[in-house]
Amino acid sequence: SAQSIAPLLDPQPGDRILDACAAPGGKATHVAELVGDQAEIWAVDRSAGRLKRVAANAARLGLASINALAADAANLLEQRPQWRESFQRILLDAPCSGLGTLARHPDARWRVTPQSIRGLLPQQQALLDGLLPLLAPQGVLVYATCTIHPDENQKQIQALLKRHPSLCLEQESQLWPDQASGGDGFYSAVLKRA
């Protein structure tokens, strides 16, 4: 499922692309490969330690277009005001409950509670609201999770569209866990700014 995210961005050579919550860098490197390493890609994650894996993966694959930045993606505009409306593509693979990965992580049954899900919602909202000012006009934002919970997915996007009427929902997909193929449950929304 994770490999289906990067193509949703429809990245183009020359684009400026932001991968928020990027570590360990699989999606950023996939994006770089899709554009032939001909874009400016920023991989942002709060964990400087985890970002080292992004740099290592990019180096291993010979990709020079990926820049790593340790920062809270929800507050990037405060840290980098020059980034306002400067990204044609933004990818947010948001922190989530992971309920779509129960087949691979059965322990989640015991750690995910209604309270823990409610605790994630403000963080997801803050990331979405914090990243939108960085999106260029006509830019594309992809929101993705590995959960099947509607509060983290469809309801989060419905609320975002109410708060930001300049956004248009271009595509939405909910994949359910598939025992036959071993695929995880996964959600994605492709949004375009007017």
Model regions: which residues?
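S-adenosylmethionine
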Residues: 1-194
